[in-house]
């Protein structure tokens, strides 16, 4: 599977030593303005939600850039301190991490350049309006190069999905088939599902129920990192679970895959890969 195997590539930035400071001046000033208390409460809630998402969804090896207050929240939530890159208010650019937590302070500091030059892709978003906090991907080559490769990136996933659908031991639901043909599925899932199908016992078949990503506010260009996977026999389902639990490095799922019942009552294995996924495969 040369085509699908070529779908994995990713670069991470370098980290710096973490140091924390108190809340920003703008946040302290807001508490004295009309409605300021409510705004502060919402700002704290948005930061906490972003920190919780980082802890539950992002690979622990990923460097994450953030302002001092946001980095403190991420550390408090459990993200490794050594992977947090603190951006002081004097930082000339937001570089240093593979992701950036774009709080209002960060958005104000870098303005429109944040998206147009450095971090074009929103992986998740919390809150709305002036208090919104976005988790953004920082591609190694910057926004222009990243956006230029998006069509090839999606086409590579489309071709990988088509190839997966030629496997007679894989039975997709209409929803899953549409997602595969639209290039919406993370390359790690494409590769893993193909491998699983080749290890099923007897005449068991792999049943693809749906692919998903529960991240709020994610860009449509972000591949789906999660899946519900069934099998035509109990032994087949057990084999799916065992295969996923045995994976390591790039193909190790985030958290433990488990068997649950889907909305129809069917037993399925749920699996999810960490963010960010391979987002530069078109240039590989």
Feature annotation, model-predicted:
Residues 1-9:
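N-terminal export and membrane-targeting signals
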Residues 12-38, 42:
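C-terminal region of N-terminal signal peptides and the immediate post-cleavage residues
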Residues 33-65:
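Membrane-embedded, lumen/periplasm-facing catalytic core of multi-pass transferases
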Residues 58, 92-96, 129:
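Extracellular/periplasmic catalytic domains that process cell-envelope and extracellular macromolecules
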Residues 58-79, 187, 199-201:
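Secreted/periplasmic proteins that engage bacterial cell-wall peptidoglycan
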Residues 67-100:
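Extracytoplasmic
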Residues 87, 97-284:
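Aromatic/acidic, Gly/Pro-rich catalytic loop(s) in extracytoplasmic/lumenal soluble domains
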């Amino acid at each position: 599977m040369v085509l699908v195997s070529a779908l994995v590539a990713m670069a991470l930035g370098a980290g710096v030593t973490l140091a924390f400071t108190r809340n920003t001046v703008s946040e302290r000033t807001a508490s004295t303005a009309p409605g300021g208390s409510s705004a502060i409460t919402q700002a704290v809630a948005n930061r906490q939600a972003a920190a919780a998402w980082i802890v539950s969804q992002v690979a622990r090896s990923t460097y994450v850039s953030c302002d001092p207050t946001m980095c403190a929240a991420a550390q408090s939530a459990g993200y490794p301190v050594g992977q947090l890159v603190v951006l002081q208010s004097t930082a000339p650019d937001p570089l240093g991490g593979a992701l950036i937590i774009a709080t209002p302070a960060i958005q104000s500091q870098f303005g429109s350049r944040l998206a147009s030059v450095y971090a074009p892709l929103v992986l998740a978003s919390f809150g709305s309006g002036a208090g919104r906090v976005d988790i953004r991907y920082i591609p190694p080559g910057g926004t222009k190069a990243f956006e230029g490769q998006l069509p090839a990136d999606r086409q590579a996933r489309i071709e990988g999905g088509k190839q997966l659908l030629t496997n007679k031991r894989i039975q997709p639901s209409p929803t899953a088939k549409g997602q595969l043909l639209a290039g919406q599925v993370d390359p790690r899932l494409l590769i893993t599902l193909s491998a699983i199908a080749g290890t099923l016992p007897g005449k068991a078949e792999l049943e693809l129920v749906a692919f998903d990503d529960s991240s709020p506010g994610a860009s449509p260009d972000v591949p789906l990192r999660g899946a519900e996977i069934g099998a035509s026999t109990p032994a087949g389902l057990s084999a799916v679970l065992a295969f996923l639990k045995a994976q390591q490095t790039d193909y190790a799922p985030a958290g433990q895959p488990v068997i649950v019942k889907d909305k129809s009552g069917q037993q399925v294995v749920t699996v999810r890969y960490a963010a960010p996924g391979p987002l530069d495969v078109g240039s590989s």
